[in-house]
Swiss-Prot record:
Residues 1-21 are annotated as: Disordered. Homotrimer. The lineage of its organism: Bacteria, Pseudomonadati, Pseudomonadota, Betaproteobacteria, Burkholderiales. It catalyses: 2 cob(II)alamin + AH2 + 2 ATP = 2 adenosylcob(III)alamin + 2 triphosphate + A + 2 H(+). The keyword Acetylation does not apply. It comes from the Bacteria. Is potentially allosterically regulated by GTP/GDP, which enhances its affinity for AdoCbl by 5-fold. Binds cob(II)alamin weakly in the absence of ATP. The presence of ATP (but not GTP or GDP) increases the affinity of cob(II)alamin for the enzyme, and stoichiometric binding is observed. GTP blocks the transfer of cob(II)alamin to IcmF from ATR, thus averting its reconstitution with inactive cofactor. This is Cobalamin adenosyltransferase. One of its GO terms (molecular function) is ATP binding. The gene is cobO. It is an enzyme of class 2 (transferase).
Length: 184
């Protein structure tokens, strides 16, 4: 593959606009760019989680796969009307959700983000994913969007919650439970 980006600083965005993949320009605060930015931030947080040295290999492989899907989603959002994320990617998340959740004990109480460092990072990914999902919902209220990306982010946030629990156990720990009857 040749050089896709040979010039990084183009100065074309200095006035507060940015170019989309179809050649159009939009404000850097547009709903579409906010959604792209939130997806990009999520992908970066997943990249940070992937730097954890003791991640189970199956979790590492799933997260790397998800990073590629999120990059595709960013591409889809950067070209209005373009479709990259489809039902099979959502189904893959459903499969991983069922697989990982089946091995976990039932929750009797809410859990707090934390436990091990990888689990805490997975919770950060989950909350950024929820924000990206909200941005996509807002964009979808303003213009027509493919349905799969919204479904994908909804499932992904659930999967990241489950993976946080898995990662706590993989590190020899457990979930941090919310204490309903704690002293003030």
């Amino acid at each position: 593959m040749g050089n896709r980006l040979s010039k990084i600083a183009t100065r074309t965005g200095d006035a507060g606009t940015t170019g989309l993949g179809d050649g159009s320009r939009v404000g850097k605060n547009s709903l579409r760019i906010v959604a792209i930015g939130d997806v990009d931030e999520l992908n970066s947080h997943i990249g940070l989680l992937l730097t954890e040295p003791d991640l189970p290999e199956d979790v590492r492989a799933a997260l790397l796969h998800i990073q590629h899907d999120l990059f595709d989603l960013g591409g889809e959002l950067s070209i209005p009307g373009y479709t990259l994320l489809k039902a099979p990617q959502v189904a893959q998340l459903d499969d991983w959700l069922a697989h990982y959740n089946a091995a976990l004990p039932r929750l009797a109480e809410f859990i707090l983000p934390g436990g091990s460092r990888p689990a805490a990072q997975a919770h950060i990914c989950r909350t950024v994913c929820r924000r990206a999902e909200r941005a996509l919902v807002e964009l979808g209220a303003a213009e027509a969007l493919n349905e799969a990306p919204r479904q994908y982010l909804n499932r992904l946030s659930d999967l990241l919650f489950v993976l946080a629990r898995v990662l706590n156990r993989a590190g020899g720990g457990s979930d941090v439970l919310w204490q309903r009857e704690r002293e003030s």
